[in-house]
Amino acid sequence: MEPLSHRGLPRLSWIDTLYSNFSYGADDYDAEGNEEQKGPPEGSETMPYIDESPTMSPQLSARSQGGGDSISPTPPEGLAPGVEAGKGLEMRKLVLSGFLASEEIYINQLEALLLPMKPLKATATTSQPVLTIQQIETIFYKIQDIYEIHKEFYDNLCPKVQQWDSQVTMGHLFQKLASQLGVYKAFVDNYKVALETAEKCSQSNNQFQKISEELKVKGPKDSRDSHTSVTMEALLYKPIDRVTRSTLVLHDLLKHTPVDHPDYPLLQDALRISQNFLSSINEDIDPRRTAVTTPKGETRQLVKDGFLVEVSEGSRKLRHVFLFTDVLLCAKLKKTSAGKHQQYDCKWYIPLADLVFPSPEESEASPQVHPFPDHELEDMKMKISALKSEIQKEKANKGQSRAIERLKKKMFENEFLLLLNSPTIPFRIHNRNGKSYLFLLSSDYERSEWREAIQKLQKKDLQAFVLSSVELQVLTGSCFKLRTVHNIPVTSNKDDDESPGLYGFLHVIVHSAKGFKQSANLYCTLEVDSFGYFVSKAKTRVFRDTTEPKWDEEFEIELEGSQSLRILCYEKCYDKTKVNKDNNEIVDKIMGKGQIQLDPQTVETKNWHTDVIEMNGIKVEFSMKFTSRDMSLKRTPSKKQSGVFGVKISVVTKRERSKVPYIVRQCVEEVEKRGIEEVGIYRISGVATDIQALKAVFDANNKDILLMLSDMDINAIAGTLKLYFRELPEPLLTDRLYPAFMEGIALSDPAAKENCMMHLLRSLPDPNLITFLFLLEHLKRVAEKEPVNKMSLHNLATVFGPTLLRPSEVESKAHLTSAADIWSHDVMAQVQVLLYYLQHPPISFAELKRNTLYFSTDV
């Protein structure tokens, strides 16, 4: 038997549909970013996996990757005793009224299905039967029992809803209905056989074909339409659909029932029975993908699907890509009018027998795609973070739902643009009979997954073919029902009760790897998800000619709502004929890849957690620990009198008899000497062990500092400079002036802003000011090489802003409640402050001190 509903988002209950003004799933947004109205899903010909999750809780409906048991959802919390009880009971009546109306329609559908059964039975014993008794019992199995159960339920519930008062009870009716769900188990077990029997009988008997194609269903009592025509196949699907609907309404009822109401425990029990029933049904179902049959009778199954960015005619388009057993199909969601069933529009397809991956040389000849400017991507991230903060404030202040929906809509639009414009890793495919296609991905892990899935299918004996227009229409039509990825991967598609992810710093040590069959030049990369998509964050050095590399390299990775860590192991390619000049075209061979969930309970400890990840027969050992953002705000002064890290900048400059600390001058000099053209300088993490070694040398004032600097990786030197500023007992721009910097950057009038921002610089202690001005000029020189190093002023402000300017621990506790809020509330302003000074004409210390044009009251 095929699996019973759509995986991913469960269907909305009627009450959620009634009150939601805007939906943020992929179903409502087409590939060019236009809103679309969502129509109700139609009954599928094959049975989708029964959705046993509560409404709007995608994380509960998704089954585990390994095909294990589905997660049993927690019953929703009811209203606290006396809390908005009147409003809750009114909502309860609305829920029941809507459910009662749908129950009437369902009973009419069952009646229509039963109507031909009696005359068919009557002819079965004659000399010219339409169907045999056995065929009739197979097709209509348990329909009569289901009808009687629901008719009794409807007759008992209807008067209670029509004569409504706050004391009415009906929990016992739902409890009884749930206790009779066993009859559905028998129906589900027989469903596929019933469909096949009905289809065979239609093909062999014209009389039954006419009956099954036009069954008359009575309209509701208040409806203008007296009857509608429905096929028998569609009506046989209705009980499958209904069993999920009953569970959804129990969630809605519990949500709007006070916990001290007599119905509450009865409804809880009914929900428990229903969920257990759905779980038991789904455990019995073969978890194979629902299949589509080709005209030749071959089985075509969906293997993989997902959202990818395609470059088409020079512009980026979001596509939904479907990989079947013999064909790759690229589609976009059609724009449809309200109430119409949503469909996909096929943009192109390639039979896997004709699909080839171009060589690096062929890829190099392909038109290159210019990446979206980094500063614009950073601006989008800042906007998203600010909108998240506004939404949290509205919720905390119990703001109007319309205002929250407007903010959510804005956030979705910005996240959609970020998702569309951030990917840069090319994934090229070619049809040997014609055109080439280009997708852009944000993760090499994801590119590898698609490539491997296609290559695995291509090992089979595949034949080339051309789909007729009808065949293509049927295949494209099946995509809506078969898809496993329902939503664009953006954070605004998450429910409020889902984990927001981790915000802070993840320290990862990549120790070693085992399991390689022959010696190779090996390295690892680390990816984490951020804003809904994965990005590469760190890379180990290459360990040459070995089967057991021992890297023992530590990295500090900033997390922004992250939930997963990916580790990829590569064999380095030194053959220049295979190296693509495109920076984003990774041609090194992936030896293995793996992913782990960043469980807050596991990683949010002060201690290191060591683990092993297995990938393709390879075992990589690593350790990690996590520091939350609020913890990272704490600056611990150094207990030792000597050294430079964690020591006040005024103490260091006085001891050294210098205006700028020696460590700052030496790191800046080395970066400008040999790192100013390094791609991603200051953004790419240096090896943590190298940084710690440099820290120890500077703290000890070792005479070999200069020699060590000249031999050290430039990213480690850049990382040492960032670490120095981060470990200052207070940030370079001081705790005292932090609120004033926040207010100054928010001023609208340019003259007032200039006056305020210059006065604030003058208010800094001399060592802080001179060091800040020295760093400013250095960062401007780095940005001058942006065409080569890809580091704009905005990128540099994003890296250094939160390090040089941070709220004090007291300040952050007084105003903010969560780590996510700290990030979204402050980082935008911190970046803007530094960017203001970076974009300002050169500022001289002497001129700043004596200039009387800048005037302001004391801060």
Swiss-Prot record:
GO terms of molecular function: GTPase activator activity; guanyl-nucleotide exchange factor activity
Stretch list, region Disordered: 27-84
SMART domains linked to this entry: C2, PH, RhoGAP, RhoGEF
Modification Phosphoserine occurs at: S57
Compartments where located: Cell projection, Dendritic spine; Cell projection, Axon; Synapse
Annotated ranges, domain PH: 301-459
Principal subcellular localization: other
Stretches with biased composition (Polar residues): 54-64
Positions of the DH domain: 91-284
Domain Rho-GAP: start-end pairs: 647-845
Oligomer and partners: Interacts with DLG4.
Domain notes: The central Dbl homology (DH) domain functions as a guanine nucleotide exchange factor (GEF) that modulates the GTPases CDC42, RHOA and RAC1. Promotes the conversion of CDC42, RHOA and RAC1 from the GDP-bound to the GTP-bound form. The C-terminus is a Rho-GAP domain which stimulates GTP hydrolysis by RAC1, RAC2 and CDC42. The protein has a unique structure having two opposing regulatory activities toward small GTP-binding proteins.
Record protein name field: Active breakpoint cluster region-related protein
